[in-house]
Structures are given as structure tokens and as C-alpha cells.
Amino acid sequence: IAAFMVMLTPWNESKLLIDPMCGSGTIAIEAAMIGANIMPGINRNFQGEELSFISKDDWIQARKEAIEKENQKEFKIYAYDIDPEMVKLAKSNAELAGVDHLIDFMKSDARKFHSTNEYGFIITNPPYGERMGEKEAVYELYKDLGRVFRRIPTWSVYIISSLENVEELFEKK
């Protein structure tokens, strides 16, 4: 879903991208892989490699061609989370994916986000409460985020959420 979400936007590696509630880092990692043109699973082995009618040389050549198409340009994606343990996990996941050099992870509260950049992209999956008591806190978070996003009106903001009436919570018309 994260890769699809990034691909649905006009973002590319030359544009600023921030995930202010990165959790385990999935959106930032997928965006880094898309920006660097890294094929999914490029570093994995597949059962298909054992098929007798496809030579090992063909697999090696296909992998080599995919790696040669990777984008070597340097760019940065910024990913924040309020929970330092999630930041640590996200960094570890980015290392495993081989894109840790493309993402700056930091502990930060999304409700305090601000930027002097005229334009950028926010792509995020905010938390949502399922238990009683959490719902009100989540609604308040979404309202706070709506205020934050209204301060950056020239930015493109993409949110994925299972909450109904997200636009109302963000007080977006």
C-alpha cells in the first residue's frame, strides 16, 4: 500500500518528501526505493531461479540490468515519529532495505511540524485508535494536524487512514 500511495502522487526524487508520522518507516522506505529506481526484491532469491527452463545466466543478467537502472542521484527523504523506539525500528528497516543513506529519521512531534520550504510533499499514515478512549485522542490529533497542514497551503498532503470523515477531522473543505 505504501509504494502504491507514493506512486499515486506526482512526487519524484527531486522534490521534498516528509512523512511526519513514519512509524516503522514503510512509506519513506518505499519512496526511497521508488526514487532510486530499486526494483522490489532485487536482493532476494526466488524459487523461480531454480526453474530448469530458465538458465542461471539469464537470472544473473536480469538482476544485473535491474541494478544498472538504479538511480545513483543523491536525494533525501525525511521521516519523523514521536516515539524514539519507532525511529530506531524505522532506521533498522531502512538499513535492511538498503536505503538508509537516503532517509533522515528523527524523533519529532508531527503537531509541531513547520517548514520554510515553499513546496513539498507530505505522505503519511497517521495512527488511528481502535479502543475506547483512544478515539477522542486520535480525533484531537487529526484536528491538530489539520491546523499544521493549513500553515503550509502550497504543500501537497496525502493521508491514508481507515477513519471515516477524515476531511472533517482535518477541517478541510
Model-derived features: where do they sit?
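Conserved S-adenosyl-L-methionine
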Residues: A2-H114, R131, A137
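Conserved Class I SAM-dependent methyltransferase catalytic core
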Residues: E74-K76, Y80, P84-K88, M132-K173
